[in-house]
Curated annotation (Swiss-Prot):
Its EC number(s): 1.2.99.-
Annotated source species: Amycolatopsis methanolica
Enzyme class label: oxidoreductase
UniProt name for this protein: DYE-linked aldehyde dehydrogenase, gamma chain
One annotated GO molecular function: 2 iron, 2 sulfur cluster binding
Superkingdom per UniProt: Bacteria
Length: 21
């Protein structure tokens, strides 16, 4: 699963497993 998180105008994308924080 791909996730994209934007923090303080910075976009961080990555690929996680089935478990999510």
């Amino acid at each position: 699963m791909k996730v994209s998180i934007e923090i303080n105008g910075t976009t961080v994308s990555x690929e996680v497993x089935d478990r999510t924080l």
